[in-house]
Regions:
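N-terminal Sec-pathway targeting helices
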Residues: 1-6
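Bacterial N-terminal signal peptides
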Residues: 7-15
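Cyclophilin-like peptidyl-prolyl cis-trans isomerases
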Residues: 14-295
Length: 295
């Protein structure tokens, strides 16, 4: 049975999504559009793109990696996860309305063999050869924004990059030229800090279990770091989904095709009965791509 993980599961018979007037009682909400999308509009996320984080207290977090945007950093992360390097480390920083960050609090652990300690910057990539689904609404941080293979992106005509939307995962780093190895990761837990776009390597997004990151007590130190080691949240393990026990594995899908186009339009122009004035637009981070658990 298909279970919707991050989309409100509201059963609805297929209806015509377009040309609906504001306040139309028959207008579906974005969640209803996603819940009633045909199976063919859901695209499988390969298991090879998934990491499974389990906190020592039993929290489960699933991260999808973005290897087509930061291949070297993602390659590092795969090696780190496969070596179980993060097992026994901790969540060390929770900054309100910003990020939660995890890794080795001692900063003394030796990186696994084959990890590149100082990769080249992977903050954007050429757009040539790609066909993003651009949206028409203006954006203060990029000439254009849109989606590519389910990822929120910005672009300037020559290059394309991932955007710092809620739940996106990036690589912690020091001042340039440092780019971070991938051993320190963070997830966005607040209003999208888009000023970080093209300044840090974004390597993926949390697709399940954000509550185990975003609901943590806020750190009281500078930048939200915990000042007392007892406050840190222990990480039981972070491993490739392929290495998880059969009972812990799950498959995921993201919404695409015509259903996503209808969903995107509905996010920008709410026509369901509660809304009197459709906004007529939405920023890319206010159109979270629906992702569901498929098994």
């Amino acid at each position: 049975m298909i279970k919707v993980a991050l989309v409100a599961a509201v059963a609805l018979a297929p209806v015509a999504w377009f040309a609906l007037a504001p306040g139309d009682a028959s207008a579906p909400s974005p969640a209803e559009i996603a819940a009633s999308a045909p199976p063919g509009d859901w695209i499988d996320i390969p298991e090879s793109e998934l990491l499974l984080m389990e906190t020592a207290e039993g929290g489960r977090v699933v991260i999808q990696m973005a290897s087509e945007f930061a291949p070297v950093h993602v390659g590092n992360i795969r090696k780190i996860a496969a070596a179980r390097w993060w097992d026994g480390t901790s969540i060390n920083r929770v900054q309100d309305n910003y990020v939660v960050q995890w890794g080795d609090a001692t900063e003394r652990k030796t990186l696994p063999e084959g990890v590149i300690a100082k990769p080249a910057a992977e903050y954007f990539r050429p757009v040539k050869g790609l066909s993003p689904d651009w949206i028409d609404w203006p954006d203060p941080y990029a000439k254009r924004t849109g989606f590519w293979k389910g990822w929120p992106v910005g672009g300037d005509g020559d290059n394309i990059w991932l955007t710092h939307c809620y739940g996106m995962v990036g690589v912690g780093r020091n001042l340039a030229p440092d780019t971070g190895s991938g051993a320190e990761l963070y997830a966005v837990i607040g209003h999208a800090p888009r000023h970080l776009d093209r300044n840090i390597a974004l390597v993926g997004r949390v697709i399940e279990g954000m509550e185990f990151l975003a609901s943590r007590p806020r750190g009281t130190g500078d930048l939200g770091f915990y000042t007392d080691g007892q406050q840190r949240i222990a990480i039981g393990s972070i491993k490739p989904m392929s290495d998880a026990e059969a009972g812990a594995k799950s498959r995921y899908q993201y919404l695409s095709s015509k259903s996503f186009s209808a969903y995107r339009d509905a996010r920008a122009n709410r026509r369901d009965p509660f809304f009197n004035v459709p906004a007529g637009g939405a920023d890319v981070c206010n159109i979270p791509v629906p992702i569901r658990r498929a098994s």
